[in-house]
């Protein structure tokens, strides 16, 4: 029974990631075909800036969250506050230097994504993780394409950012239930 549950858990992660990767590939091929080389290049340039900035803001928080959550050490809220603050600083720095609202908000979306998924995986909520991944990809496609036709390339970045909104639920739920305790950082 335990073995079949583990296979089921691993399968749900694998299937969600495969579906997510496949839909993402189709989405980006579609965006490349309608935006043209210059528009697609600009999009990937700003996504690269957002990914780099979010990785700086997350600096080890994802792995820390997975390990401590799995050990049932209640560090999440403290980690979230620190990481979200660094994410907001990154957002404003990118907005100041590149004047791109889509890339700036994408930083915050990627930070929220990293923190939320690390908690879900640390708690071994694999099916919940799968639902969030598939929901995010559906939102990425609908918002990204929809906003492209309204705002152009900037709309793709905004749509991509908006697609991470469901993950806020995990953050808010944790902030309400887990006490902030800076003494855990020794």
What annotation goes with each model-predicted range?
Residues 3-4, 35-39, 50-84, 121-127:
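Transmembrane-helix boundary and interhelical linker motifs in polytopic inner-membrane proteins
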Residues 8, 12, 16, 46, ...:
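Alpha-helical transmembrane segments of multi-pass membrane proteins
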Residues 14, 41-44, 80, 130, ...:
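Hydrophobic/aromatic positions within or immediately flanking transmembrane alpha-helices
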Residues 17, 29-33, 47, 63, ...:
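Transmembrane alpha-helix boundary and packing residues in multipass membrane permease domains
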